[in-house]
From Swiss-Prot:
PROSITE patterns: SAM_MT_RRMJ (PS51613)
Origin superkingdom: Eukaryota
GO molecular function: mRNA (nucleoside-2'-O-)-methyltransferase activity
Chain segments carrying region Disordered: 371-398
Gene Ontology biological-process entries: 7-methylguanosine mRNA capping; methylation; mRNA modification; mRNA processing
EC number from the UniProt entry: 2.1.1.57
GO cellular component, one term: cytoplasm
Full protein name: Cap-specific mRNA (nucleoside-2'-O-)-methyltransferase 1
Length: 398
């Protein structure tokens, strides 16, 4: 039987260099086709997606405790709460994604210029970043790289348990946090993104990282990609508005089957010199998480792009239940080079994920029996400890 393990994967996503610039200015900003998140997929790689969903659904029969124990036994690298260097695994995932795609090399080249003795000042933005594992990792890595003049800016939801910035960041003169124009830190509001842009206007913003997302109910876990469409697009747009030319961005994605995800990656190929999708080794092979890594920001091709992408965000997402159409799906599908790379990436990640999930399905019953036996032993031991003292023990106490 085929097996897999947690290891870093990297995919270069290219476009046809002869392809015409997508004419976003020709699209209407007053009306966007809407689909409910349940219906926001198309027939592109539908059989692969449905096969993956079918394997995921089989997990419903496994108790959560048994699933977690089996997963951790088979894939120990990605244990929750790993804190060897950072406060959680997210920091590892960011640095591994940057390493596998050459972001460190690109930033070093950009910052050092002609002189390696005095690196240029460098700022990064951590969007939807609370409690701050990405920022924590970047400061640690920055010290290792010798970037002494590193400054971070962060925006996250205010007043949400678990998303408050780490005290080490709040107390650092190298970190500035904001909660946007209205004080909520809500990235769904374009005005809050623009507030962060205004605050960082004079900063040498060469890196934007975004790890935003939210838990979805187990019953709709297969739709996490489309349910997360709004926050995914908002973070991607924030990077475009924040970055200086030459900068890089790292954005968390889930599955990349939907037309919106595909369009975002395709447009990125016109906005950056190089586009990758990375699956870092600390990102569990059993899940769909991956990272869009864009290198060497070129700027908007024209002002019309900026206006349309803003308009789409502000008017297209009427609520959290529907996903608007960013552009005609044919614009992506007709680019054979781009589609070949996307299909290969989706096939590889999904196939590995299905193999990992099947490994869990095959091993879960034995692990569940081990857990039951352990529970029985623990209960028996506890009952023994609570029993009255034997006559011999009574004499000894006397």
């Amino acid at each position: 039987m085929r097996t897999v393990e947690d290891r870093s994967l990297e995919f270069l996503i290219r476009r046809d260099r002869e392809a015409e610039l997508p004419p976003l200015a020709s699209l209407c900003c007053n009306y966007f086709k809407q689909r409910h998140w349940r219906d926001a997929f198309d027939d592109e790689q539908a059989s692969l997606r449905e096969e993956l969903w079918a394997v995921k659904t089989q997990l419903d029969t496994i108790p959560m405790e048994a699933y977690t124990a089996t997963r951790n036994k088979l894939f120990p690298l990605a244990l929750s709460g790993e804190q060897q260097q950072f406060s959680n695994r997210a920091g590892h995932k960011l640095l591994e994604s940057m390493e596998s795609t050459g972001v460190w090399m690109e930033l070093s080249k950009l910052l050092c210029g002609k002189s390696r003795k005095r690196p240029r000042d460098f700022a990064f933005a951590d969007v939807c970043g609370g409690p701050g594992a990405f920022s924590q990792a970047l400061f640690k890595a920055g010290r290792k790289q010798g970037w002494r003049h590193l400054h971070g800016y962060g925006m996250t939801l205010a007043g949400v348990s678990g998303l408050d910035w780490y005290n080490s960041l709040l107390n650092s003169p190298q970190f500035t946090c904001t909660y946007g124009l209205d004080g909520t830190g809500d990235i769904f509001k374009l005005s809050n993104i623009d507030c962060l842009v205004s605050i960082t206007k004079a900063a040498p913003m060469f890196l934007v990282v975004a790890d935003g997302g939210f838990s979805v109910d187990f019953s709709v876990a297969n739709y996490q990609e489309t349910i997360s469409s709004r926050i995914m697009y908002g973070q991607w747009l924030a990077a475009l508005k924040l970055l200086r030319k030459g900068g890089c961005c790292v954005l968390k994605l889930f599955d990349t089957f939907s037309p919106l995800s595909r369009a975002v990656v395709y447009l990125s190929c016109f906005l950056y010199s190089r586009v990758h999708v990375a699956k870092p080794r600390h990102s569990r092979v059993v899940n769909s998480e991956r990272y869009l890594v864009c290198v060497d920001f070129l700027g908007y091709p024209n002002e019309a792009w900026g206006r349309y992408l803003d308009c789409f965000y502000e008017l297209g997402f009427v609520d959290n239940e529907h996903v608007p159409e960013l552009m005609p799906r044919e614009w992506c599908l007709q680019d054979e080079i781009f589609m070949a790379d996307m299909r290969d990436m989706n096939m590889t990640v999904a196939t590995n994920q299905m193999t990992a999930l099947q490994m869990i399905l095959n091993a879960a019953s034995a692990v569940e029996e081990e857990l039951k036996a352990k529970e029985t032993t623990t209960r028996t031991s506890a009952e023994s400890d609570d029993s009255p003292l034997s006559s011999r023990e009574s004499c000894k106490d006397g």
